[in-house]
Amino acid sequence: GLEYWGARDLPFGVVGSVVKNRCLLIGDAACLANPLCYGGIGAAMLSGRRAVESIVEGRPERYSRWISKDRMFDPRFLDAHRIFSSWNDAEIIDAMHPFEKGYSVPRGVFAIFRRPKWARVYMGVFLAFRLGW
C-alpha cells in the first residue's frame, strides 16, 4: 500500500545568505516562495537563471545583490503574511469590509485611510497583484 509521508512546510522569507563559497541557493532552498500565495515555481526558475548568469560572469555576489533588491522578494510580502496569519475571525471581517463590493485601487486607498492598522497588509497584497504574484 501507500505510505503517508506527511506534508512539509513551504519555506519563505529570504535566508541569511544565498551565496556561500561555491554554492548558490535558488528557489525553495533560498526560501524564495511568495509568502502571500506560496507561489514558488516562477521564483525558482528566475532565481536559477540569475544564479547561472552570475556564475558564468564569475560574479556570484551579483546574484545575492539581485535577491536583496528585486521587488519580487519585497519584505512587505512577509510582513503582510505575518500580520494576517495572526488574525482572528473579527479581524478578517474588519480588514475585508472595505472590499465587500469588489476590489479596485480606489477601494484600496479608502481601506488604508479607514483602517490604517491594516495598511501594511493592503500594501503587500497590492504589490503582489501589481507584480503578478
Question: What does each model-identified segment do?
Answer:
Residues 1-54, 61-67:
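FAD/FMN-dependent oxidoreductases across multiple families
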Residues 14-17, 52-95:
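Active-site-proximal substrate-binding core of FAD-dependent oxidoreductases
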Residues 17-34, 78-107:
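Short, Lys/Arg-enriched charge-dense amphipathic segments
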Residues 20, 49, 59, 69, ...:
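Context-gated lysine
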Residues 44, 69-72, 83, 124, ...:
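A generic structural signal for solvent-exposed, polar alpha-helical segments
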Residues 89-133:
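C-terminal auxiliary extensions adjacent to catalytic cores
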